[in-house]
């Protein structure tokens, strides 16, 4: 009997909990309807209000469904454990549970409330979706209007009226309409989303190509290239590799003969053993440069894979790229004039400063070695003598044409620091 009483108590508690939750749903719906008709209702924030109400309603709906599930499970156990009472007694648990008018009324009430609230939520969501669609269309037209204006610069246009006056008037209008808190909240959410999305996209753009090329290289490319090379018996030596290999072989041969002379073992060595030793040196040298040739081909293929991966990311996530560009511009323009001038001066000195030719020479030599070539001094000298000059001209044109229009104070600070 204790088990029967415990199960019956669970049935009553579950049904009571579901019934109380349904009454809360009914009350919340009525309160929201009264709030919409009151003077405190703000049409600009009804979306946030409905989102909160929708969240609370879903929470109570989940409580009802979970309580009804416990109710049904407990009823099944009760019916399973009392077959004799079900068939012979009108006072049995079966009769009390399934033929009780109060229980039937509560279940009908709960079902009606659930159906009504789901219909109401569906209508509100459809209306909410239509409003969002209209807002997106308005925003799209607004952005198209901005993009069509070629003379627009960064975030603020340059007109006859100074920008400080327009900003002051806009803030004054915002204060009068009482929307300062709402605008600040939206700006904060937008800035937070912009920063997080930009940082995520930046890490994704840097790490994903590196991970893809590394996995492709380690898992399949190295093994396939070695098998193909050994099977085809290719001896791929370009002109630069031949020069390097020949020079290294001459150095190794000189060291070998010097070692024989200093140790006074030349008389004890036969001509055949000396030739065999030199042959082994040549074979080891060929194996070394064969591996370098394989490594060069692997690096070329992985470079193409990395470039292809970056291109795919840029094509797929164009919106994220736009957000990243906007965030970087906003970050740069939010700095003080001194910091802006400092970063511009730092970048220009690194790329086109007095000591920059040495850095360009090192960079060009690394590129030559990466592709398996001997650094060509003529090409390196030509690049170092022309590219920084072209880059310096482009930077000066950018400062004169673009930066001088946006913020003349940055240009003045830059020239003062440069002098």
Curated annotation (Swiss-Prot):
Membrane association type = Multi-pass membrane protein
Provide an example Pfam family for this protein.
CemA
Entry keywords, A to Z: Antiport, Chloroplast, Hydrogen ion transport, Ion transport, Membrane, Plastid, Plastid inner membrane, Potassium, Potassium transport, Transmembrane, Transmembrane helix, Transport
Molecular function (Gene Ontology), one example = proton transmembrane transporter activity
Q: Which reaction equations make up its catalytic activity?
A: K(+)(in) + H(+)(out) = K(+)(out) + H(+)(in)
GO cellular-component term (any): chloroplast inner membrane
Q: TM segments?
A: 196-216, 297-317, 344-364, 371-391
InterPro entries to which the protein is assigned, alphabetical: CemA
The compartments listed are: Plastid, Chloroplast inner membrane
**What GO biological process term is on the record, naming one?**
potassium ion transport
Which domain of life does this protein belong to? Answer: Eukaryota
Under PANTHER family, the record lists: CHLOROPLAST ENVELOPE MEMBRANE PROTEIN, CHLOROPLAST ENVELOPE MEMBRANE PROTEIN-RELATED
Family membership, please give it.
Belongs to the CemA family.
The task this protein performs is described as: Contributes to K(+)/H(+) antiport activity by supporting proton efflux to control proton extrusion and homeostasis in chloroplasts in a light-dependent manner to modulate photosynthesis. Prevents excessive induction of non-photochemical quenching (NPQ) under continuous-light conditions. Indirectly promotes efficient inorganic carbon uptake into chloroplasts.
Q: What is this protein called?
A: Potassium/proton antiporter CemA
Q: Which organism is it from?
A: Chara vulgaris (Common stonewort)
- Source lineage: Eukaryota, Viridiplantae, Streptophyta, Charophyceae, Charales
């Amino acid at each position: 009997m204790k088990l029967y009483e415990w199960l019956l108590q669970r049935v009553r508690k579950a049904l009571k909990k579901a019934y109380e939750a349904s009454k809360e749903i009914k009350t919340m719906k009525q309160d929201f309807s009264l709030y919409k008709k009151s003077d405190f209702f703000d049409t600009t924030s009804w979306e946030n209000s409905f989102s909160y109400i929708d969240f609370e309603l879903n929470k109570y709906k989940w409580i009802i469904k979970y309580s009804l599930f416990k109710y049904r499970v407990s009823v099944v156990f009760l019916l399973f454990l009392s077959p004799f009472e079900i068939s012979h007694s009108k006072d049995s648990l079966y009769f009390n549970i399934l033929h009780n008018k109060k229980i039937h009324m509560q279940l009908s009430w709960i079902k009606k409330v659930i159906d009504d609230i789901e219909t109401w939520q569906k209508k509100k969501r459809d209306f909410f979706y239509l409003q969002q669609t209209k807002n997106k269309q308005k925003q799209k037209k607004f952005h198209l209007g901005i993009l069509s204006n070629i003379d627009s610069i960064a975030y603020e246009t340059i007109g006859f009226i100074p920008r400080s006056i327009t900003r002051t008037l806009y803030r004054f209008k915002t204060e009068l309409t009482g929307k300062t808190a709402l605008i600040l909240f939206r700006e904060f959410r937008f800035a937070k989303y912009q920063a997080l999305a930009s940082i995520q996209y930046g890490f994704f753009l840097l790490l994903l190509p590196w991970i893809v090329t590394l996995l492709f290289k380690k898992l399949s490319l190295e093994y396939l290239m070695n098998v193909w090379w050994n099977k085809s018996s290719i001896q791929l030596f370009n002109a630069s590799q031949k020069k390097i290999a020949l020079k290294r072989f001459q150095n190794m041969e000189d060291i070998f003969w010097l070692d024989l002379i200093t140790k006074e073992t030349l008389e004890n060595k036969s001509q055949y053993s000396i030739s065999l030793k030199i042959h082994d040196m040549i074979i080891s040298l060929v194996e070394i440069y064969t591996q370098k040739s394989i490594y060069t081909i692997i690096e070329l293929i992985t470079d193409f894979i990395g470039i292809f991966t970056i291109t795919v990311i840029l094509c797929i996530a164009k919106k994220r790229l736009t957000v990243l560009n906007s965030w970087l511009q906003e970050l740069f323009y939010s700095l003080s004039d001194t910091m802006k001038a400092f970063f511009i001066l730092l970048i220009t000195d690194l790329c086109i400063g007095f000591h920059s030719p040495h850095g360009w020479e090192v960079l060009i030599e690394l590129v030559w070695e990466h592709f398996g070539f001997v650094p060509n001094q003529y090409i390196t000298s030509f690049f170092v003598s022309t590219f920084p000059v072209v880059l310096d001209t482009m930077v000066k044109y950018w400062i004169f044409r673009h930066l001088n229009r946006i913020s003349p104070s940055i240009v003045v600070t830059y020239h003062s620091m440069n002098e």
